[in-house]
């Protein structure tokens, strides 16, 4: 039986309200002061711009909190399956509020930013949040997954540069592309052995059996599926980064041989 504490419900609702405010007010207010290009965007682009701004803010908040928990929350680190999930619940509650907020925006602005993949992703993520918030299960693993959010701001920044008219060979775009590739590898690929090392360490334990077959299957299947997608995305991102760097180098060599630089 799910047991959502009043505190986690309050944080989730507050999180939803804050992210709605940031989308409708905060993002536009800040963006107009950071770049004049925001005024030149179409209404459709402004909607996606605000959505991605909120996405980046959420990623930084929960990512930093995730790292803090991984380093300092002894209870969760000592018992990754049933350790005291209080700190993790706070972080996951913030994420739940964001996911619900983003789902509402996707549905309301379906013509502009509607995407069946993101709806499926958000619903699956909320299902995972249920196990942490409602059942107190798998706090370490639920929190560990949030470290992947650190790559999100770089992905969003690539889109910002694109709509602002930056060339893919421009220095800011190339630096961001390299940072995106590196961050994606570190927080989504390099951590895979660490994650599954902790997963395998729980097999056969009393804590693992207490989960029940349903939670066990949901946990393992979702983890493997997510990491398969991460590997596929990593390959695509790495190829794109290599292609841009290789062609940029080729262009510089060609222009230098012609006696001028573009």
From Swiss-Prot:
It is a multi-pass membrane protein. It comes from Xenopus laevis. Keywords: Membrane, Transmembrane, Transmembrane helix. GO terms for cellular component: endoplasmic reticulum; membrane. The lineage of its organism: Eukaryota, Metazoa, Chordata, Craniata, Vertebrata. This is TLC domain-containing protein 4-B. InterPro entries: TLC-dom (IPR006634), TLCD (IPR050846). Belongs to the TLCD4 family. Residues 44-246 form the TLC domain. The keyword Magnesium does not apply. The chain crosses the membrane at residues 6-26, 53-73, 90-110, 122-142, 177-197, 218-238. It is found in: Membrane. GO terms for biological process: lipid homeostasis. The keyword Cell membrane does not apply.
